[in-house]
A protein has these predicted regions:
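Local cysteine-cluster metal-coordination motifs and their immediate loop/turn environment
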Residues: 21-36, 64-74, 182-188, 272-285
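Extended interfacial segments that mediate partner engagement and assembly in macromolecular machines
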Residues: 88-108, 112-115
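Portal/gating segments that form or line small-molecule/metal binding sites
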Residues: 108, 113-173
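Long, compositionally biased charged/polar accessory segments in the mid-to-C-terminal portions
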Residues: 127-128, 231-411
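Intrinsically disordered, low-complexity linker/loop segments enriched in Gly/Pro
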Residues: 148-203, 209-215
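Short, flexible loop segments at boundaries between secondary-structure elements
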Residues: 201-224, 322, 347
Length: 411
């Protein structure tokens, strides 16, 4: 006898496949297809979709899910009129930039440009709301937030190096919204709204360079090494900002503890990024209208220098709309912009440059070790890896060996 599954049951099956293969990025896009899904932190400290009830479900939820889920597929976006850089993606223009408001520049992760643009979009009426992320009531964790004022934009400034599912906020699909989201979220949202633009659902998407989502447990462990117990109530916790690159800082009222970015990200948080992020083809936000990144100063070897200073961003317009917004904001005195070459950004972003350059090799090693990856289209990954075949072979072998060792250790 053939059993007919409901749409929500079919969606659940597809979600289980992605989660069981460790390919979920925790973006929350699936919750927009079915109101009975919630994003919850699992035992490893990552956000995953969980069925809480049978809610309102899109009539083509399962089909749509297979088109938008970053754990299933990601495609390179090439907007009309854009140029193409092999590792930084498609773009129309690129600038060195920072917020002209000194408080926003100081509070933001690099130059404060996304915070400044968010506030200006609201104050100028170009957006009715900006959906992003901010600290939860317990600032050890992060939550989606709908921002409607300059003060709220400033309160949400700075990176949050802990899981948050920005797309679990339904406001992302309201007309006249802007959304500040991770690259995987930008990809899912761009794919989701593509057929909805005639209905007026076409959010301005702002993103940022992303090296991956660390486990929330890494934050707890880092705090413990700094003497902050899990039971200690925190008033504030910021990962970056308040300078550039800014220090990981926690405050419980009477006491403040902090550690530098190189140690917080490099030693404690970064090593815990989830598997899906390790095979990400798009840490540079190709599906967004506007993307910000750190425009690092580098040493003689080309590695970023993390000494404190005034924040400086690279600001990329990937679409005509994004370029228009950036130029209007500059004319309005919101941000400073100086035209720059994309090669100069690639030179100071070694992680993004190397990850994309050898991702095909990493994927090959992963598949040979029996670990599947999503389908990636349009990034030219094979061609990039073939430019340096010996190093690509080394990356493949290393990936294969690490996966096999991890599997044997867990048996």
């Amino acid at each position: 006898m053939t059993v007919s599954l409901s749409e929500s049951e079919r969606l659940d099956e597809r979600i289980r496949e992605v989660v069981s293969r460790d390919l979920c990025s925790g973006c929350g896009a699936c919750t927009l297809l079915d109101s009975g899904l919630d994003m919850r932190e699992n035992e490893a400290g990552y956000l995953r979709p969980v069925r809480s009830t049978r809610g309102m479900v899109d009539t083509r939820a399962e089909v749509t899910f297979r088109k938008i889920c970053p754990g299933v597929t990601v495609s390179s976006n090439r907007a009309y009129g854009s140029k193409r850089h092999p590792v930084m993606g498609s773009y129309r223009e690129m600038w060195v930039s920072w917020a002209l408001d000194s408080e926003m520049r100081h509070r933001g992760s690099s130059g404060g440009v996304l915070t400044a643009l968010s506030a200006w979009l609201l104050e100028s009426g170009r957006a009715a709301r900006v959906v992003g992320a901010q600290a939860a009531p317990d600032p050890r964790r992060s939550i989606p937030v709908t921002i409607t004022t300059r003060a709220e934009a400033l309160a949400a400034a700075g990176s949050r190096y802990t899981p948050v599912a920005t797309l679990s906020a339904p406001d992302v699909l309201l007309a006249n919204s802007a959304v500040v989201a991770k690259p995987c979220e930008a990809s899912a949202l761009s794919s989701l709204v593509a057929p909805l633009k005639e209905q007026g659902i076409d959010p301005l998407i702002l993103s940022f360079f992303c090296a991956g989502t660390p486990s929330a447990i890494a934050t707890d462990r880092l705090l413990l090494t700094l003497g902050v117990e899990s039971t200690t109530p925190l008033e504030e916790l910021w990962y970056r900002g308040h300078g550039w690159p800014g220090r990981f800082t926690a405050r419980d009222g009477a006491t403040t503890v902090s550690v530098g970015y190189d140690e917080s990200w490099g030693s404690a948080l970064g090593p815990t990024t989830q598997w899906r992020c390790k095979v990400c083809p798009d840490g540079v936000g190709e599906s967004a209208d506007i993307v910000a990144a750190d425009y690092w100063q580098v040493d003689g070897r080309g590695y970023p220098i993390f000494s404190e200073g005034d924040g400086t961003s690279a600001l990329i317009a990937r679409t005509k709309r994004g370029a228009e917004v950036i130029r209007e904001a500059a004319r309005a005195g919101i941000i400073h912009i100086e035209i720059a070459r994309m090669d100069s950004l690639a030179a100071v972003q070694p992680l993004q440059r190397d990850r994309r350059s050898f991702l095909a090799a990493r994927i090959l090693g992963s598949i040979l070790a029996g670990r599947p990856t999503p389908v990636f289209r349009g990034f030219g990954l094979i061609r990039l890896s073939l430019r340096h075949p010996l190093r690509a072979m080394s990356v493949s072998r290393g990936t294969y060996s690490r996966i096999r060792r991890a599997r044997n250790a867990s048996v």
